[in-house]
A protein has these predicted regions:
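ATP-dependent adenylate-handling active sites, centered on carboxylate activation for C-N bond formation
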Residues: 1-170
Length: 170
């Protein structure tokens, strides 16, 4: 309700469970509101023309007949700057630095292509909150094992962040 009906909305999109859920939720909400989903884009990063995420993103959307929403952002390997990521996130955890390095490169690419774009949505972090994918390899995955994982420091997740119940950390 706070975004004007003509403003474009971008999703940082890998085609995984997190970004896929975010994209499909936004797509569904726009349709339910009678608004055009044409304002929605699924931005995916492709480094040096070779990207497992870009391939996965294309497969995800193509299987749903939504491939027209995908917009790959190409960058060179030199366009990935882990030192900038460390400065921005003030963190040294390897997975956080990797994630931030890619997100910054993707955002720079989007800004270069669309200098007036204002709204981006991201589903990053779900893998960490579920102790990583694929789920079939996580035989001990339960809600309790997730909540007791003290490594879930991101976004206030983790057992110390429980505010209301064992299944909602809102």
């Amino acid at each position: 309700d706070r975004i004007a009906p003509r403003e474009p909305i971008g999703v940082l999109f890998s085609g995984g469970v997190d970004s896929g859920s975010v994209f499909l939720t936004l797509y569904s909400l726009l349709l339910a509101r009678g608004e055009t989903p044409a304002r929605l884009k699924a931005f995916t990063l492709s480094v040096g023309g070779d990207s497992a995420d870009a391939d996965q993103a294309a497969r995800f959307l193509d299987q749903l007949g939504l491939g027209l929403f995908l917009e790959p952002i190409e960058v060179t390997l030199e366009g990935i700057d882990y030192q900038e990521a460390i400065r921005v996130i003030e963190d040294y955890k390897p997975l956080d630095v990797q994630s931030a390095s890619m997100a910054l490169a993707l955002c720079r690419g989007i800004r270069s292509r669309y200098p007036d774009w204002h709204y981006l949505v991201d589903g990053d972090g779900g893998d960490e909150n579920l102790k990583d994918y694929p789920l079939e390899d996580s035989h001990n995955l339960t809600i309790r094992s997730v909540l007791n994982n003290t490594l879930l420091y991101q976004e206030g997740w983790g057992v110390d962040a429980i505010k209301h119940s064992l299944t909602y950390s809102g």
